[in-house]
Every structure is written in structure tokens, then in C-alpha cells.
Amino acid sequence: MAINGRYFVQFRRRREGRTDYYQRQRLIVSGRNRMVVRKTNRHIIIQLIAAQMDGDYTLVHVNSRELVNFGYKGYLGNTPAAYLTGMLFAVRAQKAGYEGGIADIGLQVASTGARVFAAIKGAVDAGFDVPVGEAILPDDDRCNGAHIAEYDERFAGLVENVEATKDAIMKELE
């Protein structure tokens, strides 16, 4: 609570550590729709958000849980699932008439090859225009699950499953 004029109460979402308003302002001033990528422990969530004066509007929403409908049998929170979710997002966004956006990873740490960048790479590979540097994106072996299949023989068919799911997602674009 403010006691005198020298005390400044921060916005609630800033106090909770949920929003970086400086970053949000720079993204909104760009004038482009935001491709918002969020990760949980079990899923990847991608949304296309348009900022308006009366609030933000969700234009396209994709959750990695939807990959099961395309035949994906792997874990829904790993790098291949993030890549496939990004592809599914790009297909749905293009069908809705949106060609591009600007990446918004929020307060997540931007480390090379992270799941959020796998999702962005999936969207870029499916034809969605997102300005991103190639150096921070994960390589193709991580996106198709080769590192997981190499680690444990129980996941030997993961690479083929990722490729089959990728083909099923791209068929939705047609």
C-alpha cells in the first residue's frame, strides 16, 4: 500500500513476476500479431494474439494435446512435440488467413535449442513467417526425436512416428 508520494506500487502482474511490460510494449509497438509460445511440464501451448486497445484477442490456439489426433504416440512436452505443435499452429494460422507474426516467449529463458524455439522452428518450416535467428533454433535431429531414440531403445520408432505425424499435419493444410 502506498504510504506517501515517493512510494510506487508496481502492477500486479509485474509484482507476481508474470509479465515483463517493457518487452510486451516493444512487441505490441511492432504492429504485428504475436506468436505466443508457452510451455508447461506436460504440454506446449501456442497462440496467435492480436493486441487491441480493449484487450488482447486470441486468433489461433493450438495445444500439444491435439497431436494425438494426428497419430503422435510420444510424450507431449518434449522437443519433437513442440516442433510438431509449431507445425500444426502454422497450418491452422495459414488456413485462418494469417501469414506471420513475431515470436513472444514471455519470461522463459532464451537458450539455444530450447523447446520454445523448437515450436518456432516447426512454424517456420511449415511456412509461417516469424523473424528468428537460425543459430538459436534446434537442429533437425532434436526436432525429429533422434536424440531420444538414441538414448533408449524403447523409443526406437519415435523418429518414424514424428515423420508420420508431420505428414498428417501437412495434409490438413491441403
Swiss-Prot record:
CDD domains in the cross-refs: Ribosomal_L18_L5e
Positions of disulphide bridges: none
Record-linked SUPFAM superfamilies: Translational machinery components (SSF53137)
Keyword tags: Ribonucleoprotein, Ribosomal protein, RNA-binding, rRNA-binding
Gene Ontology terms for molecular function: 5S rRNA binding; structural constituent of ribosome
A GO cellular component annotation in the UniProt record: cytosolic large ribosomal subunit
Gene Ontology BP term (one): ribosomal large subunit assembly
Pfam families the UniProt entry points to: Ribosomal_L5e
Alphabetized PANTHER family for the sequence: LARGE RIBOSOMAL SUBUNIT PROTEIN UL18 (PTHR23410:SF12), RIBOSOMAL PROTEIN L5-RELATED (PTHR23410)
UniProt subunit comment: Part of the 50S ribosomal subunit. Contacts the 5S and 23S rRNAs.
Family: Belongs to the universal ribosomal protein uL18 family.
Entry-linked HAMAP family: Ribosomal_uL18_A
Purpose of the protein: This is one of the proteins that bind and probably mediate the attachment of the 5S RNA into the large ribosomal subunit, where it forms part of the central protuberance.
Protein name: Large ribosomal subunit protein uL18
Organism name: Methanocorpusculum labreanum (strain ATCC 43576 / DSM 4855 / Z)
